[in-house]
């Protein structure tokens, strides 16, 4: 394989700012911001708006929002 073709794959911390959930994993992403992890080392910090810790589908707080009666309109159109 060629040298210097693939991006570097390093440890990073992803921080879900909505739920204040942090996870240490590996990624090709990098950041100038760092955070001290539980093991005492500094890792690049990637802030995300939503993750599995805060997404309604994964948290079980999923609800259907009917905007403008679309569901009723659909059910009337295709009712048997």
Curated annotation (Swiss-Prot):
UniProt key word Ribosomal protein: yes
PROSITE patterns per the UniProt record, alphabetical: RIBOSOMAL_L31
Keywords: Ribonucleoprotein, Ribosomal protein
InterPro entries: Ribosomal_bL28/bL31-like_sf, Ribosomal_bL31, Ribosomal_bL31_B, Ribosomal_bL31_sf
Biological process per Gene Ontology, one example term: translation
Pfam families the UniProt entry points to: Ribosomal_L31
Assembly and interaction partners: Part of the 50S ribosomal subunit.
Membership in a protein family: Belongs to the bacterial ribosomal protein bL31 family. Type B subfamily.
NCBIfam families: L31 (TIGR00105), PRK01678.1 (NF002462)
Protein name from the UniProt record: Large ribosomal subunit protein bL31B
Organism: Xanthomonas campestris pv. campestris (strain ATCC 33913 / DSM 3586 / NCPPB 528 / LMG 568 / P 25)
């Amino acid at each position: 394989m060629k040298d210097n073709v693939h991006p570097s794959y390093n440890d990073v911390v992803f921080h879900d700012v909505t739920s204040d959930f942090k996870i240490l994993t590996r990624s090709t992403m990098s950041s100038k911001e760092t955070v001290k992890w539980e093991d005492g080392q500094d890792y690049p910090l990637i802030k995300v708006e939503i993750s599995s810790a805060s997404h309604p589908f994964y948290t079980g707080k999923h609800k259907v929002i009917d905007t403008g009666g679309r569901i009723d309109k659909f059910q009337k159109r295709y009712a048997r």
